[in-house]
């Protein structure tokens, strides 16, 4: 039988009580958000006639998600991260700010505290038996389009199994493997030697993949490399590049692929190029320049503060 009680005074009063709106104390913003989200969920239960069994399956699911530390993985899978980017893009458009280098999601796997160097860094420790050398370099430009020395370029990516150091279930990787901060040189350039990453897949037995299965969706990301770029007088840029040609480039479960962020990995076998780049054999090269945007009235109006692992 279908009953409709959501719009009764009883239920509406109850929502205010449960959200603390009839109480002194607490945090008004939290009350406002909880009241709205709770109301939307109560209404969904009524509209969709969600059963008690379905509801309790959801509660058990949330417990599992937390126990597996996967809330930050499900979030991009359900598009929240990309939606927040779309909102920031729209805010920028309304302010007339052009992002020559598009932003895209941070993902849940950044770790603060990576080794820092000027101009160049070797990112991998040479231990990945399937590693194919990658030389990745480019120039950071300021808001006027001039090369920007002394910008901080933080780069992180996965190994050839798609695992990130500090989050690697095999325990094979050393701390900060394939995580570096490079300060741009006097020409605004950064350069790293590393290995080509592989695409990433959600833990196959985890709760994120379990829900994606119910949606008929896969949990794969294309091979990608993350960036934070920050510099005085500029807004911090959070983005990623995708290695062109990956089967998931335009089918990313986390919806991070954007026009302008797909970069060719050009293969070099020529002995001259091998020598000039100081590598041992054939290697791939990717070139990616990034352009920053100015602070807005002296502040970074879009900097994201979120809990991050720091080592
Ligand atoms: C996820 C993993 C990533 O490497 C990433 O960049 C974004 C999201 C994830 O597991 O959700
Ligand atoms: Fe990632």
Curated annotation (Swiss-Prot):
It comes from the Bacteria. Catechol binds at residues 164, 224-226. Gene3D superfamilies: Aromatic compound dioxygenase. Keywords: Aromatic hydrocarbons catabolism, Dioxygenase, Iron, Metal-binding, Oxidoreductase. One of its GO terms (molecular function) is ferric iron binding. Its EC number is 1.13.11.1. Transmembrane segments: none annotated. The keyword Metal-binding applies. One of its GO terms (biological process) is beta-ketoadipate pathway. It catalyses: catechol + O2 = cis,cis-muconate + 2 H(+). PANTHER family: DIOXYGENASE, PUTATIVE (AFU_ORTHOLOGUE AFUA_2G02910)-RELATED, INTRADIOL RING-CLEAVAGE DIOXYGENASES DOMAIN-CONTAINING PROTEIN-RELATED. This is Catechol 1,2-dioxygenase.
């Amino acid at each position: 039988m279908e009953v409709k009680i959501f719009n009764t005074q009883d239920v509406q009063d109850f929502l205010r009580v449960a959200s603390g709106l009839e109480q002194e104390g607490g945090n008004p913003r939290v009350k406002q958000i909880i009241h709205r989200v709770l109301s939307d969920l109560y209404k969904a239960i009524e509209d969709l006639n969600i059963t008690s069994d379905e509801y309790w399956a959801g509660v058990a699911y949330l417990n599992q998600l937390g126990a597996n530390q996967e809330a930050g993985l499900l979030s991009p899978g359900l598009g929240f991260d990309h939606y927040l980017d779309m909102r920031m893009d729209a805010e920028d458009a309304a302010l007339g700010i052009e992002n020559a280098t598009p932003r895209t999601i941070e993902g849940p796997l950044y770790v603060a505290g990576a080794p820092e160097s000027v101009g160049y860094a070797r990112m991998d420790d040479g231990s990945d038996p399937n590693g194919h050398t990658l030389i990745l370099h480019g120039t950071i430009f300021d808001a006027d389009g001039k090369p920007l020395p002394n910008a901080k370029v933080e780069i992180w990516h996965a190994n050839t199994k798609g695992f990130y150091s500090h989050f690697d279930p095999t325990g094979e990787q050393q701390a900060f493997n394939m995580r570096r901060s490079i300060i741009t040189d006097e020409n605004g350039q950064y350069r790293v030697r590393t290995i080509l990453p592989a695409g990433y897949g959600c833990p196959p037995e985890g709760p994120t993949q379990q829900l994606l299965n119910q949606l008929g969706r896969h949990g794969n990301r294309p091979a990608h490399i993350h960036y934070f770029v920050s510099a005085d007088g500029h807004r911090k840029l959070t983005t990623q590049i995708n290695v062109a040609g990956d089967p998931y480039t335009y089918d990313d479960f986390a919806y991070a692929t954007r026009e302008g962020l797909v970069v060719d990995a050009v293969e070099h076998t020529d002995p001259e190029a091998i020598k000039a780049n100081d590598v041992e054999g054939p290697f791939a090269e990717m070139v990616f320049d990034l352009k920053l945007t100015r602070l807005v009235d002296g502040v970074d109006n879009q900097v994201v503060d979120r809990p991050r692992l720091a080592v």
